[in-house]
């Protein structure tokens, strides 16, 4: 086994690293150890190897470990005058000092230097100063009441070299990481603080792993479970000056991981804004609607949620006992009989507010659908109890329907036994669900998902997981945290509704109250306060703020046939033309107010979609779908037309509308076009909704209902599903000619399972064989360009062909690709100068937007050139002016 070979090599490695060993750091019986710092430490709690080794070495010490680390943290947030910008947490979360006291830390293990290293040589002196202040401040803290805290510094690990073109290059990262590790060693020595040089250790480990064909990180900078397992014994030796314990430690590690899971649920609790932040102060009558006066006893969110936090603390402590017992060679069963009680309250809605739920079939009788359309029930909770509170849906390359089910909404209680799930429905010929498989169980607030290669990305803040079924049983048996640091301050606003762009980038968002910071291999942490949409390249791990804006809750993201996106802020159901305000603007700044592209009749909106299906009439194609759950409870249908550089919307006949008096629980939450061209949508199926209108633990919050419906158009044939799964590259490329947007997306997902070099070679051949007289030639060629983008392979010749297309839609789409290839094509500003002078304002808009990503005043000149094509440069197109103003605001700092 490769891993076994690597671990054997690790024994040999120990002899070459003896110079790194500390004098022999000692832990005393009963001590509490707190880990602070960046994602390296954060991930350690989920792998558990180093902690397991320490318990195995000191089985009678009954040590307590609490992980307080978070991706993106920097030492500047931990000094005597902490800068909150470098330790972002939601409102009233508490300082590092607060948490060290709360966990009664006797010993602090601090992991810094990675995020700081992006400041390069210019930041070294500042880093050393802050590190010195941190040491002095921390050593002056008596967190446990037993004496001042003892400190150990751990350097960052090295970046792992790789020949994978989709990984960040290790060499430039290591040039800085080596300097910052040396700076840590220098400051640690001056402060007489034990220091563990993980940079040197990991560098040696990478070399040995490479000889066995193994990698220890999944993205150059973050360790896999195997990487953590390889690092742990060497870190142990460097810290304690002796060889790590051997033998089978699986049971001990399992106990450690269970304890860490419960602690993570406590420390990174969901809905922190309601647990200890601004909305924790909201109060409601204990007797609910039965309260007789305004002076009746009240109970706040804080009251109840602090009771739950106390339960989580006790649960974690109970699992400490199991760890100690197993470390001593015994066994122990978790005993949670000592959990403190949680206060309860009655609903603030009267009993007669809660009426019996009509069945899914009965509910259809009280729905009105668009003329010619027909609605049928696909699945409901009576048949499939797992289908509770569906929040996102999508069809995979096999034609199966996936649904994220969120019965715990707004979040799990400490004692819940039923967890949230990612479900997979097999459908019959009639389009109805015949079977359900739970792909992922044990989740807490799975607010979004997206298919990726042979697996699925799942949002479960603070993380995005990549989960796969490797043995073919339909259930996930492998998963990896691929993004860390999304805030979970409010589950209403947590990262959600993942959506693919046509070039393989995927988008996710979070809303107000959130303080997100995510680590990447490409620069400092991506940080944002309050609303933002983020752009992630799953293949490369590149991550950036896509639309930082004053959103409350941007739940809606949908792309049209040509890659134009419509963005929806759910709370106010404000809908925007995405290209206008998705240019670069440096954090913490946000884009200014943008006009809505459509005046919505009602709010709020939990999800959006787009009609792209020949099963529906021609005048339905490209219609924007907008779900609504209060007042109007149904799905709006919107005609989308060109409006200069942008788009505009016109309200049409509703797709579906519920009779609020008869089915008040009808709450359409998400939608998707099926492979046969029909439209599916989920019904959240709740009478009581809203975070702040009711206590977070109002007993009226339904945990069991959920429905899926299907809309077809009478008199029109359903589409024959295009076979995607398992098809060869050539057939998948032909599928890119299909008019349906979702079919083309699924074809590109399937293509991503194939070797990129082979896909791109076949794509070049396919593109060369396209008929230039085909009315859709421009779109087919654009799809070829998007396939290149999806596989992260630049083809300048193809790019230039599409940039010069006779179809302005294609030219605009290619300009967007040029923006993301700007660092890999020759003279990108020269290309953009031509686009900025294009006859069509959409192309000029994309050129202006692209200019915002440069760091030179020459880009501003190119952007300004777009005005020359305006009929009246003093009164330009609205979107041109908006985007130009934002671009110049960004570029104004460059001379």
Q: What residue spans do the PLM features occupy?
A:
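Bacterial N-terminal signal peptides that target proteins for export
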Residues: 1-10
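Extracellular/periplasmic ectodomains of large secreted or surface enzymes and adhesion receptors
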Residues: 263, 278, 288-377, 589, ...
């Amino acid at each position: 086994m490769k891993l076994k070979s690597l671990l054997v090599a690790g024994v040999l490695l120990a002899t070459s690293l003896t110079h790194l060993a500390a004098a022999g750091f000692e832990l005393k019986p009963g001590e509490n150890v707190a880990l602070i710092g960046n994602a390296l430490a954060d991930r350690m709690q989920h792998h558990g190897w180093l902690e397991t080794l320490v318990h195995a070495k000191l089985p009678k010490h009954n040590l307590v470990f609490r992980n307080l680390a978070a991706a993106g943290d920097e030492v500047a947030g931990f000094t005597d005058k902490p800068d909150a910008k470098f330790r972002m947490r939601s409102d009233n979360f508490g300082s590092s000092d607060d948490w060290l006291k709360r966990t009664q830390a006797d010993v602090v293990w601090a992991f810094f230097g990675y995020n700081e290293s992006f400041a390069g040589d210019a930041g070294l002196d500042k880093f050393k100063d802050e590190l010195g202040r941190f040491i002095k401040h921390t050593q002056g803290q008596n967190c446990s009441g037993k004496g001042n805290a003892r400190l150990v510094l751990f350097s960052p690990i090295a970046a792992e070299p790789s020949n994978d073109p989709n990984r960040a290059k290790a060499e430039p990262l290591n040039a800085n990481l080596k300097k910052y590790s040396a700076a840590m060693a220098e400051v640690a020595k001056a402060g007489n603080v034990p220091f563990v040089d993980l940079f040197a250790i990991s560098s040696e480990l990478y070399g040995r792993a490479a000889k066995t064909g193994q990698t220890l990180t999944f993205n150059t900078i973050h360790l896999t479970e195997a990487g953590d397992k390889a690092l742990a014994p060497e870190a142990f030796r460097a810290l304690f000056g002796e060889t790590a314990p051997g033998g089978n430690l699986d049971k001990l590690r399992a106990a450690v991981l269970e304890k860490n899971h419960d602690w993570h649920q406590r420390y990174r609790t969901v809905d922190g804004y309601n647990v200890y932040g601004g909305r924790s102060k909201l109060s409601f009558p204990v007797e609910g609607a039965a309260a007789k006066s305004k002076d009746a006893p009240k109970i706040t969110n804080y009251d109840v949620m602090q009771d739950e936090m106390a339960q989580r603390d006790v649960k974690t402590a109970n699992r400490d006992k199991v760890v100690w017992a197993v470390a001593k060679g015994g066994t122990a069963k978790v005993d949670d009989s000592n959990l403190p009680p949680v206060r309860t309250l009655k609903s603030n809605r009267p009993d007669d507010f809660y009426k019996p739920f009509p069945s899914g079939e009965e509910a259809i009788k009280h729905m009105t659908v668009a003329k010619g359309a027909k609605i049928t029930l696909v699945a409901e909770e009576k048949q499939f109890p797992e289908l509770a509170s569906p929040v996102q849906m999508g069809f995979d390359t096999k034609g199966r329907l996936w649904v994220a089910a969120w019965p715990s909404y707004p979040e799990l209680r400490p004692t819940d036994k039923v967890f949230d799930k990612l479900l997979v429905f097999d459908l019959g010929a009639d389009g109805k669900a015949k079977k359900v498989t739970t792909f992922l169980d044990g989740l807490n607030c799975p607010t979004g998902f997206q298919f990726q290669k042979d697996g699925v990305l799942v949002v479960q803040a603070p993380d995005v997981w990549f989960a796969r079924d490797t043995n073919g049983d339909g259930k996930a048996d492998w998963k990896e945290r691929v993004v860390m640091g999304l805030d979970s301050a409010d589950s209403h606003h947590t990262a959600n509704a993942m959506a693919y762009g046509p070039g393989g980038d995927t988008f996710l968002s979070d809303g107000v109250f959130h303080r997100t910071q995510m680590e990447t291999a490409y620069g400092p942490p991506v940080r944002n306060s309050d609303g933002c949409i983020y752009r992630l390249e799953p293949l490369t791990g590149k991550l950036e703020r896509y639309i930082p804006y004053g959103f409350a809750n941007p739940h809606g993201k949908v792309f049209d046939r040509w890659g134009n996106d419509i963005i929806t802020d759910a709370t106010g159901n404000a809908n925007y033309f995405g290209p206008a305000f998705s240019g670069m603007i440096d954090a913490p700044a946000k884009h200014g107010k943008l006009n809505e592209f459509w005046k919505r009749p009602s709010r709020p909106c939990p999800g959006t979609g787009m009609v792209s299906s020949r099963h529906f009439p021609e005048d339905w194609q490209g219609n924007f779908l907008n779900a609504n759950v209060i007042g109007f409870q149904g799905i709006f249908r919107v005609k989308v037309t060109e409006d200069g550089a942008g788009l505009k919307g016109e309200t049409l006949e509703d797709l579906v509308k519920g009779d609020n008096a008869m089915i008040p629980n009808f709450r359409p939450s998400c939608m998707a076009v099926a492979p046969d061209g029909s439209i599916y949508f989920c019904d959240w199926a709740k009478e009581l909704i809203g975070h702040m209108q009711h206590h977070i633990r109002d007993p009226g919050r339904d945990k069991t209902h959920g429905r899926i419906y299907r809309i077809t158009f009478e008199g029109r044939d359903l589409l024959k599903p295009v076979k995607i799964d398992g098809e060869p590259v050539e057939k998948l490329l032909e599928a890119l000619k299909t008019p349906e947007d979702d079919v083309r997306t699924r074809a590109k997902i399937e293509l991503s399972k194939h070797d990129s070099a082979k896909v791109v070679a076949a794509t070049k051949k396919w593109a060369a064989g396209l008929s230039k007289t085909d009315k859709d030639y421009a779109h087919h060629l654009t799809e070829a360009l998007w396939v290149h983008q999806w596989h992260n392979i630049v083809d300048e010749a193809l790019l230039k062909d599409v940039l010069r297309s006779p179809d302005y839609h294609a030219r605009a789409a290619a300009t967007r690709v040029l923006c993301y290839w700007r660092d890999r094509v020759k003279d990108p500003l020269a290309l953009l100068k031509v686009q900025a002078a294009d006859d069509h304002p959409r192309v000029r808009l994309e050129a202006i937007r692209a200019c915002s990503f440069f760091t030179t005043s020459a880009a501003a000149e190119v952007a300004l050139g777009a005005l020359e094509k305006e009929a009246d440069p003093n009164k330009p197109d609205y979107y041109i002016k908006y985007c130009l103003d934002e671009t110049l605001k960004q570029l104004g700092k460059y001379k």
